[in-house]
Amino acid sequence: MERYMIHLKNNGYHQVHSSELVHRARELCSDMHASIRVARVASKFLEFDVSVNPDNLGMLIEKLSPIGELDNTRHVVEEKIEKEAGIKDGIFYFNNERFWESHESLEGVWKKCYGKEKELVQGIILLAVAFAHGQKDESNVGIGMLERALEKLGNSPAMYGNIDVDRIRNKIKEMQKSKGLTIFEI
């Protein structure tokens, strides 16, 4: 079996529906050999983290169709990617509410960093993971991660490439104060 992120169009679901969605997906696919790990709810799509034999991927997607129309599918493999491309991908995924994939892309970048840069990238990764928890209706876990994210960002430079780190720090502080996760773009 191989791992995939399946994105279905969101037709009115909210993060509170995450558990219900994963149970429904498991029911719909109960007659096939597949693992539905988790459902994350974004504003425009539902993300299902699944493992299935590649030959059965089409059947799995068809079985999930009562939940929503297919938006896209991504085969999850550890990619060897240049640092700048990893940053670009991480930003793209983050800004499109694909926070788990942002985390994965930025983790590849993190492995190529040293010192303060490594800490800064880890802070952004922790923020992405906090939002991924929010998408599973685990906002309290996500809010708890914000302090670690802020610590990792530390007093790093205001900008990291095209990423406004000062803005991220300020947004994290606002979320800590409000005790809520508020999605924004980086």
Spans of model-derived segments:
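TPR/TPR-like (Sel1-like) alpha-helical repeat modules
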Residues: 138-157
